[in-house]
Every structure is written in C-alpha cells, then in structure tokens.
C-alpha cells in the first residue's frame, strides 16, 4: 500500500468555507459586514470572520475545522 493510499482525503477550502458559513449564518444572520480569512494550519483549517469596519465594536466567529472530516473542532463568537 502506498503512502498516498494511507492518507485520508483533505477537504478543499471551498468545502471548509461552506461548513463555517452555515454555522456563522445561524449565529449572525447577515455576514455581509465581515471579510472572511481562511488558512490551512497544522491543527486544521482556520476560518475567521473579521469585521470590515475596523472601528466597529464586536467581531465575528472564528473556527478551526478538521481537514479530513469537516467537523468544527473549535469555534469562538465575538459579539
């Protein structure tokens, strides 16, 4: 068995973004005021919803998502 066969398939950034957006939409409803940043890190996909207006109070959700299963490992809401 080759190494490639042993590795689990990784989710694409689009798939991960869909998971994060579904959860964020339930919590925040209007996501238009956020810029979304996504990066693959050693502990999973990091998806951050940051306010476009730096002077506004509050913030958006922040996620770490498992790259294989798409499960939200951690989430933090700033409101």
Q: Model-flagged regions — what are they?
A:
Residues 1-79:
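Long, terminal "pre-/pro-" and other extracytoplasmic accessory regions
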């Amino acid at each position: 068995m080759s190494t490639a066969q042993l590795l689990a398939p990784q989710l694409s950034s689009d798939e991960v973004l869909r998971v994060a957006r579904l959860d964020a939409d339930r919590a925040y409803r209007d996501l238009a005021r956020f810029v979304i940043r996504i990066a693959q890190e050693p502990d999973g996909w990091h998806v951050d919803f940051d306010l476009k207006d730096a002077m506004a109070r509050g913030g958006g959700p922040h996620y770490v998502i498992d790259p294989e299963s798409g499960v939200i490992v951690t989430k933090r809401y700033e409101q």
